[in-house]
Amino acid sequence: MDIEKMTTTMQEALGSAQQIAQVRHHQVIEVPHLWRIFVQPNSFGANFYKDLGIDLDDFTNLIEKEIDKINSVEGSNITYGQNLSPDLFQVFTEADKIAQKMGDEYLSTEIILLALFELKQNPLTEYLVSHGLTKAKAQAAIEKLRGGDKVTSQNAEETYKALEKYGVDLVAQVKSGNQDPVIGRDEEIRDVIRVLSRKTKNNPVLIGEPGVGKTAIVEGLAQRIVRKDVPENLKDKTIFSLDMGALIAGAKYRGEFEERLKAVLNEVKKADGQIILFIDELHTIVGAGKTEGSMDAGNLLKPMLARGELHLIGATTLDEYRKYMETDKALERRFQKVLVTEPTVEDTISILRGLKERFEIHHGVTIHDNALVAAATLSNRYITDRFLPDKAIDLIDEASATIRVEMNSLPTELDQANRRLMQLEIEEAALKKERDDASKKRLEIIRGEIAELREENNQLKAQWEAEKKEVGNISEKRNELEHARHELEEAQNEGNLEKAAALRYGKIPEIEKELKAIEEKAKSDDLSLVQESVTEEQIAEVVGRMTGIPITKLVEGEREKLLHLPETLHQRVVGQDEAVEAVSDAIIRARAGIQDPNRPLGSFLFLGPTGVGKTELAKALAENLFDSEEHMVRIDMSEYMEKHSVSRLVGAPPGYVGYDEGGQLTEAVRRNPYTIILLDEIEKAHPDVFNILLQVLDDGRLTDSKGVLVDFKNTVLIMTSNVGSQYLLDNVGENGEISEETTENVMSQLRAHFKPEFLNRIDDTILFKPLALEDIKNIILKMTSQLAHRLEEMEVELELSEEVKVWIAENAYEPAYGARPLKRYLTKVIENPLAKLIIGGKIPPKSKVIVRLIDNKVDFDVQSIAE
């Protein structure tokens, strides 16, 4: 017996059998040791016996018992599992004879399985024969398995039933009802049929964006083959989807991958045109399995494709086709392109209506038609980086899964009742230990409450169980209907008209009637604890979760918040009514859903002197909308003064450092499409920056350096500038009004600085007024209240007299600098002295500091707060 003349699988099996013998302290390798390896799950031997009707669990138990009967030998100088037992040696001797007779170069597993029958008295042989597996039957199965081939390589077992092992029969999947229906795409399916019917170049490749339904077209073809809705030349053909991953996985030795692929191709060749091969992600064949000196899958396929011996359908995306397939011209010309475009919203709704029943059965929910329409329209509008119908199907699936999880979870009412009951029971247990009258009285009250709650709890639980059962009945009946329809389809395909008639006119109408009655009952019962309907509201919630864009119906609290948005913004931004109003209106328009869907929510240019609240307004808006001013894309345009720095907004071009990182503007918006973009000090930027902003302002879109389209339709663009601020400072009226002449002067300076095509695209240009003395007082009030809030954490109260506030306002106010000097002045005259007093221990906790003005100087009076 030469181990080198065995196949790799056989060598590994013998090695594993030796390990069993060593672990069990058996001196020699016996027949049961080796057979224990042969019947391991998914092994060649296990599949062989299973196909021939042997109960593997029963057979494995027998092998284990036989191993247990072998005596263990103990000792210090004993070697275990180094030799074969006489029985096993006889099996190998007989196997050698059979292999020579069959003309095999290597000893393979199936020959060893056949040689076992030569051991007439062996319990394993007796078991197999008693269960109907004779030597003749096993030999016939081996001949069928091999298909007349001889074992000429060490990977022989890998090549048996190669298509079954490395592929999925799509036609068989359709027959078993494991495939979703394919709706529409008739034109593309006809194109594929036309290409498959050609004499040469009869290999279609489906090219389209990810998620448009390329694989579904092949599944649709498989469904047509089952329905016999194809030309004569395609009737009774089988489509096998080849799994390239499984083909490559575990190919350890050089040539093993090629051998597996050749085995697949030989099976296809032997089928004489009855098998159509489908390779999803076709580009993977270019370079697949290529190691030093070996061929890749693409080159192995070329000869058969050229001779027309292989019918192959491929599917790949546009980018991958260009990157991999077009580089290999010889391979590319053997395929005929079939372009698969993205379906329209209307087509997507039709597709969703076709899939609706499948999702209802899988999740056990009811999907309303308005949810399907919402999924198609909302995904098309808000999820811009993916394609229909995939993104719409995802929304339906996600919303259905959410409802399903809620159905299986405890309802809020029941959960609250349970928690309250637990709380009262804990209180009852504590009061039992008390002896005073008040506790006894309270205990009686609590026991009464517990009794009431338990009754309410039991009622709720019974109602919930009943509602769940009702929903479960609907789901079961839908499953029954689906099964009956599948049976009808099978009967029609087989030509069993009697069965088809019984199903169509008897069983199916009866189930439909029962289902309708159950659904009507559920509707009239008005399920209050179990929500089993998927409506447009759930779809909107899912879109909101995925994109961060709020599109759900407004709840009462949010309505109030939006209507009072100007007042809320004024709490942070003093004055500037026009600017606050314009920004608030843009947000209200967006949430009402009436803004132009092809433009940003709003684009504003804020003009005015420094320190009047331009940037502060953007921050206040971000805080109000997103609860944090960090949720704002702030770009300081002074960083973009050089021409070359423009590329940082959209990303560096290919070949430059930072190409992989993406643009600062595009990446921020791509990750968070609902945001506020603040372009601060825009006049400082290079003029080329404005060219990039043109399409953002007009169409709400921008293409980054990688060619990815970024959607700006859900952003608010705020640009700030100091252009013309001198006119505003010099010519503002006493009551803070800006004269028409001043406005015209500012606008003319603006037109001189920015191009007309840029200014023309901005929704509103707003002039910020210089701050009046009254505004300054309000700002001081705001700043001092912030300081007082910080001191509260140290248990110190702060009080400023009115004259101090007026004095700070008069001394700190400089119209040219706005509100910024106030902060500096307040730090100098209030915060610094306060800090020194705190560090010196003169302001202990639980004290009050009153700030007064004495002889034109600030005085701090520290008082203790009485407990």
Curated annotation (Swiss-Prot):
| Stretches for region Repeat 1 | 6-70
Q: Name one Pfam family in it.
A: ClpB_D2-small
Q: Supply the SUPFAM superfamilies for this chain.
A: Double Clp-N motif (SSF81923), P-loop containing nucleoside triphosphate hydrolases (SSF52540)
Binding-site residues for ATP 2, renumbered to this chain: 608-615
Q: Which residues form the Clp R domain?
A: 3-148
The intrachain disulfides are none
- Tell me, in one coarse class, where this protein mainly resides: cytoplasm
This entry's Gene Ontology molecular function terms read: ATP binding; ATP hydrolysis activity
List every stretch annotated NBD1: 161-342
- Stimuli inducing this protein: By heat shock.
Q: Which UniProt keywords apply?
A: ATP-binding, Chaperone, Coiled coil, Cytoplasm, Nucleotide-binding, Repeat, Stress response
| Localization terms from the record | Cytoplasm
- Provide one Gene Ontology cellular component: cytoplasm
Taxonomically, which superkingdom?
Answer: Bacteria
- For ATP 1, which residues are the binding ones? 208-215
Residue ranges, annotated region (NBD2): 558-770
Q: Which Gene3D superfamilies match?
A: 1.10.8.60, Clp, N-terminal domain, P-loop containing nucleotide triphosphate hydrolases
Q: Which GO terms of type biological process are on file?
A: cellular response to heat; protein refolding
Region C-terminal: which residues?
A: 771-867
* Assembly and binders: Homohexamer. The oligomerization is ATP-dependent.
Q: What does this protein do?
A: Part of a stress-induced multi-chaperone system, it is involved in the recovery of the cell from heat-induced damage, in cooperation with DnaK, DnaJ and GrpE. Acts before DnaK, in the processing of protein aggregates. Protein binding stimulates the ATPase activity; ATP hydrolysis unfolds the denatured protein aggregates, which probably helps expose new hydrophobic binding sites on the surface of ClpB-bound aggregates, contributing to the solubilization and refolding of denatured protein aggregates by DnaK.
Q: Which family does it belong to?
A: Belongs to the ClpA/ClpB family.
Q: What is this protein called?
A: Chaperone protein ClpB
